């Protein structure tokens, strides 16, 4: 039984480790940028670190430069703790990859797991590129469309962003053609429109981008039979992964507890049933049946021997119980005369 209990506890532990993944003392917080991760030169961005864990302190630092770590006291509202870090006015030295951590009051030197990385990019440093659409900015639903970003500047990389999306696409610039460098972004069959912009950057300064191109509105006409959901629209079939992990972990714990309880109850019932059966065995199988020892008549004594619920009987017959049949030998007595002295 002890082996079964240990096995179930181990299974529950590893499943819970899968439902709630973490590296630090507490779960990782989330890091967001307001109004967005692309920040124009000299403007300010707010980096918000938040969590449903009641952290008292939040720390923010930029990768590669730990001396830039910032510390704020957390605010608590509606079960959420958060801290807003103001970064700006934006310069090249402030661009980079940021992470944040949480900490509670009684353990200020024990940090949570780090948040997911957030790239903060400074824009507006170089000449803006041009953005165009092929076959055009207005396409039929399901029709393929390609956006081309080009410039006379020798950018190594071009970046395409869609309004409302946090992540951008990037492609290396192609060879110079007719005095311009260009990168093509195939979007595939069009299902949803949107406003797009592109930027250029150099390989040795990936967080420093050019001015954005003029915005390009891509319109999709018609109703496709099977349209994909827009990346900016929440899907009703997709829930919060963290809440889903919590729900799965709780269900696993409850199931393991019920199985353990059923196993212990089954063992207890079996032991109790065996004890009752032993107490109710016939008394005749465990006692010696005999008459009063003072009587002279021969008698038969029957013993019952109990050995792990298997009964064997021995029948013992006293010598007087042997059959009273006359012996076959004939004995003849002869009277002899007394000898005189």
Curated annotation (Swiss-Prot):
Pfam families xrefs: ig
InterPro entries: Ig-like_dom_sf (IPR036179), Ig-like_fold (IPR013783), Ig-like_Receptors_ImmuneReg (IPR050412), Ig_sub (IPR003599), Immunoglobulin_dom (IPR013151)
Keywords: Cell membrane, Disulfide bond, Glycoprotein, Immunoglobulin domain, Membrane, Receptor, Repeat, Signal, Transmembrane, Transmembrane helix
Disulfide-bonded cysteines: 49-100, 149-198
Cellular component terms per the entry's GO annotation: membrane; plasma membrane
Membrane topology: Single-pass type I membrane protein
Cytoplasmic side: 266-341
GO biological process, one term: immune response-regulating signaling pathway
Top-rank taxon, per record: Eukaryota
Transmembrane segments: 246-265
Locations listed in the record: Cell membrane
UniProt keyword Signal present: yes
Compositional bias (Low complexity): 223-239
Molecular function via GO: antigen binding; identical protein binding; signaling receptor activity
UniProt region (Disordered), positions on chain: 220-239
Signal peptide range in chain numbering: 1-21
Glycosylation sites: 84, 178, 211
SMART domains with a match to the protein in the record: IG
Family the entry assigns: Belongs to the immunoglobulin superfamily.
PANTHER family, per database record: IMMUNOGLOBULIN SUBTYPE DOMAIN-CONTAINING PROTEIN-RELATED, MHC CLASS I NK CELL RECEPTOR
Function: Receptor on natural killer (NK) cells for HLA-C alleles (HLA-Cw1, HLA-Cw3 and HLA-Cw7). Inhibits the activity of NK cells thus preventing cell lysis.
Subunit text: Interacts with ARRB2.
Listed name of the protein: Killer cell immunoglobulin-like receptor 2DL3
Organism: Homo sapiens
Gene (UniProt): KIR2DL3
């Amino acid at each position: 039984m002890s082996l079964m209990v240990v096995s179930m506890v181990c299974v529950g532990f590893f499943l819970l480790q899968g439902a709630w993944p973490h590296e630090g003392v507490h779960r990782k917080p989330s890091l967001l940028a307001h109004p967005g991760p692309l920040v124009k030169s000299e403007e300010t961005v707010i980096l918000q670190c938040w969590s449903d864990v009641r952290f008292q302190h939040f720390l923010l630092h930029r990768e590669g430069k730990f001396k830039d770590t910032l510390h704020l006291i957390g605010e608590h509202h509606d079960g959420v703790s958060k801290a807003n870090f103001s970064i700006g006015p934006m310069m090249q030295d402030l661009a980079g990859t940021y992470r944040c951590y949480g900490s509670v009051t009684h353990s200020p030197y024990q940090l949570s797991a780090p948040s997911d990385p957030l790239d903060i990019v400074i824009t507006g440093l170089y000449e803006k590129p041009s953005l165009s659409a092929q076959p055009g900015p207005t396409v039929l639903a399901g029709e393929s469309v390609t956006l081309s970003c080009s410039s006379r500047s020798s950018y190594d990389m071009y970046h395409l962003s869609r309004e409302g999306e946090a992540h951008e696409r990037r492609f290396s610039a192609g060879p110079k053609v007719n005095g311009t460098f260009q990168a093509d972004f195939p979007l595939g069959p069009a299902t949803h429109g949107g406003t797009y912009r592109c930027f250029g950057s150099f390989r040795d300064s990936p967080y420093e981008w050019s001015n954005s191109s003029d915005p390009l509105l891509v319109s999709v006409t018609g109703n496709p039979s099977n349209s994909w959901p827009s990346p900016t629209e929440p899907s009703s079939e997709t829930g919060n992964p963290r809440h889903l992990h919590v729900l799965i972990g709780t269900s696993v714990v409850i199931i393991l507890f019920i199985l353990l309880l059923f196993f212990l109850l089954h063992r207890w019932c079996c032991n109790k049933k065996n004890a009752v059966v032993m107490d109710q065995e016939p008394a005749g199988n465990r006692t010696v049946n005999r008459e009063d020892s003072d009587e002279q008549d021969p008698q038969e004594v029957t013993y019952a021997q109990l050995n792990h619920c298997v009964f064997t009987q021995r029948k013992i017959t006293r010598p007087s119980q042997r059959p009273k049949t006359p012996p076959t030998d004939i004995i003849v007595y002869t009277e002899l005369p007394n000898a005189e002295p």
